[in-house]
């Protein structure tokens, strides 16, 4: 009944038609109706109308906000986590496999939320970090193996150097001894040469004396000293005049030898082979 009265009453009001030419009513005109919510009067959409669409529209911004916040958290946490991992890597340089497993577990813990992110840049960043860490670990192992090999080579070369230095010291000592022995041998050789020369001179003089003694009728078996002493012995003997062997002997005479030595000689005036002149 109220609606019919309102319709009939509204059709006769000129001011109302002037204010609302398109039939749109104000909130004051609709205040007489019993609407449950004031938003219905003001033109809003109440909460009990299209609840599923409203909830769906409300959920999508929340999901996008969560993803963006998670991506921003991962992006913000990536430098910090990388710094922490680099610090741990520098502290555990040259460590065992336990340190590597610890760093990998730490990487898994810190990179877990980022791996769940839908942003491909974050996924690539995490994969690149893992790849760099693995490459660094392999490089450390190669460097450690190369360093151990170099240390073993250094030890071996040091041993060889010590052995060669000892051999060089022994060779120098032997060389010094050989030089000293060579000098001694040279002096001995010079002394022997002098002795040989003296012996040759003595042999030459002895041969000459023996030749002179042979010419004088002396036995050639006598040595030079005995040949030189024979005239002295013969000078002290008494010669018999009737002895045919001593009849031709006269007093000895001195002869000057080429070496400066003076010897005695006897003349054979009555010798059958002839006499020896001075």
From Swiss-Prot:
Main localization, broad class: nucleus
All residue ranges annotated as the bZIP domain in the record: 122-185
GO molecular function ontology, one term from the record: DNA-binding transcription factor activity
Annotated compartments: Nucleus
Disulphide bonds in the chain: none
Region (Leucine-zipper): 150-164
Cross-referenced Pfam families: bZIP_1
Region Basic motif, residue ranges: 124-143
Region annotation Disordered: where it falls in the sequence: 85-119
SMART domains from the UniProt entry: BRLZ (SM00338)
GO cellular component: nucleus
Keywords: DNA-binding, Nucleus, Transcription, Transcription regulation
Role description: Probable transcription factor that binds to the DNA specific sequence 5'-TGAGTCA-3' found in seed storage protein gene promoters.
Protein name (Swiss-Prot/TrEMBL): bZIP transcription factor RISBZ4
The species this protein was found in: Oryza sativa subsp. japonica (Rice)
Chain's gene name: RISBZ4
